[in-house]
């Protein structure tokens, strides 16, 4: 992906917290370029600081050192150009699928007919047509995550952050959602930064994989994934890359 536009740049960012009167380093001197329309996966062992990095990009937390640039301009705090999908599906249980998906546009004052048309487009895109009037309690885990993805896309983000969005799903549903998010990304072509601790998931989805060390998070290696889509998980090159990354991944202690 050399020569492609840099959409997001992390320059020497670090994060630390005070815990029990001691300084806890969560991320140290992380630098990273994310290309426009790239599907970038941040991979690392559990509790290594992946989510901390994502929270800094989202503006939920401010780095103690370094800076974050979006289209060459430093960002501080939340930015409407960045959307986020969490592992825990933050849906409003008292609102229908349509009301959840259109909620961000409603807050922006978008007229009802216009926001409903946009929301319907993404409800259809994630395969939930016919469930517009359903409430979250009536949906499966995978369907709830589809609602979260549709809601994020409805707000028209330039960058979509996904924090282990399929971690709580069973294996079969997780695989189906991996296929689905790849299809949606190929249709919409937004920049996606996807966090996971699952090596096979990373190789299946990514254009590039950024492997982090155990906590505090540092960039340990970067892998280009030059495999055709849709990917075959038993392809020899897929298996070779998965093995190489596995052997280079720190254990979570």
Question: Where do the language-model regions lie?
Answer:
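Conserved ABC ATPase "signature" region
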Residues: 106, 113-131
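Helix-to-loop junction immediately C-terminal to a conserved catalytic motif
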Residues: 58
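Conserved ABC transporter NBD signature motif
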Residues: 66-78
């Amino acid at each position: 992906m050399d020569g492609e536009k840099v959409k997001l740049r992390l320059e020497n960012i670090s994060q630390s917290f005070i815990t029990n009167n001691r300084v806890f380093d969560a991320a140290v001197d992380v630098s990273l370029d994310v290309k426009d329309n790239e599907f970038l996966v941040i991979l690392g062992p559990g509790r290594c600081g992946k989510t901390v990095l994502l929270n800094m990009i989202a503006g939920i937390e401010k780095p103690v050192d370094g800076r974050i640039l979006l289209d060459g301009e430093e960002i501080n705090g939340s930015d409407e150009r960045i959307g986020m999908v969490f592992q825990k599906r933050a849906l409003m249980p008292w609102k229908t699928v349509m009301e959840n998906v259109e909620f961000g546009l409603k807050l922006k004052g978008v007229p009802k007919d216009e926001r409903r048309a946009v929301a319907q487009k993404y409800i259809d895109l994630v395969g939930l047509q016919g469930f517009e009037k359903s409430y979250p309690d009536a949906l499966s885990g995978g369907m709830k995550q589809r609602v979260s993805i549709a809601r994020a896309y409805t707000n028209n983000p330039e960058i979509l952050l996904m924090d282990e969005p399929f971690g709580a799903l069973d294996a079969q549903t997780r695989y189906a959602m991996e296929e689905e998010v790849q299809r949606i990304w190929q249709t919409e072509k937004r920049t996606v930064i996807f966090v996971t601790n699952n090596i096979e998931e990373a190789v299946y989805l990514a254009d590039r994989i950024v492997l982090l060390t155990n906590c505090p998070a540092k960039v340990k290696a970067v892998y280009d994934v030059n495999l055709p889509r849709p990917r075959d998980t038993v392809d020899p090159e897929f298996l070779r890359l998965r093995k190489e990354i596995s052997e280079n991944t720190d254990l979570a202690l």
